[in-house]
Design a protein with these regions (language model features):
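Catalytic domains of carbohydrate-active enzymes, especially glycoside hydrolases
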Residues: 26-53, 154-159
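Short, solvent-exposed loop/turn and secondary-structure capping segments
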Residues: 15-17, 47, 55-58, 104-109, ...
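Polysaccharide-binding and catalytic clefts of secreted carbohydrate-active enzymes
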Residues: 41, 89, 118-192
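Aromatic-lined carbohydrate-binding/catalytic grooves of carbohydrate-active enzymes
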Residues: 38-74
Length: 192
């Protein structure tokens, strides 16, 4: 595999005057052609950057990357478009998921009312760096699994990539409750 990461920054349509499917397709096709011409055979595209989706999801709202506002349907499925373009150019495509990040201190500007954290803030934690799903929380882990399963079942992708999968803070309060439950269930001897 000779892969290249295509981040949400390269896919961003927020400042484009034309946010249509045709405009997105042209933007992505240029990325794909340039990557292929540079000798790459795989694109690793960021499809879930902020607990949102660049595809039609029953678990996550549409990403603000496509329309400028999280939760607003752009009128097309960006992942489907990217899969089609990669297939036409004989490129593999991997879906890149940021499993924990909900927001940074500035992005997105507002969370959709359908964002999983807005629906149930018990699944995440606010830190000085933003809001993140808590990987010690069972509901958060299940949400991540459900989201990846949804991608694998619904799209012709060749792989899943995780990035930014580390804890967002060193503060032990981040998962204190879950850790106490773990110690109670597993026992002190099995804890680091």
């Amino acid at each position: 595999m000779r892969g290249v990461w295509v981040s949400y920054i390269e896919l961003d349509m927020q400042n484009e005057t034309d946010k249509s499917e045709a405009s997105f397709r042209e933007k992505f096709k240029n990325i794909a052609i340039n990557s292929k011409n540079a000798g790459f055979n795989t694109l690793i595209v960021q499809v879930r950057p902020f607990c949102d989706a660049l595809y039609d999801s029953k678990f996550f709202p549409y990403s603000h990357i496509l329309s400028g506002e999280q939760g607003v349907n752009p009128g097309y499925d960006a992942l489907e478009v990217m899969c089609e373009v990669c297939s036409q150019l004989d490129l593999d495509i991997h879906a890149w998921v940021n499993p924990y990040r909900i927001s940074t201190d500035s992005t997105p500007q507002a969370l959709s009312e359908t964002n999983p954290y807005v629906i149930d803030n018990e699944i995440g934690e606010e830190t000085e760096n933003g809001i993140f799903l808590n990987p010690a929380n069972k509901m958060a882990r299940n949400l991540i699994i459900d989201g990846v399963t949804e991608i694998v079942r619904n799209y012709d992708i060749d792989g899943i990539q995780f990035d930014d999968y580390f804890y967002p803070t060193q503060d032990s309060d981040f998962d204190n409750t879950e850790y106490a439950d773990y110690v109670e269930t597993v026992g002190e001897m099995n804890c680091m």
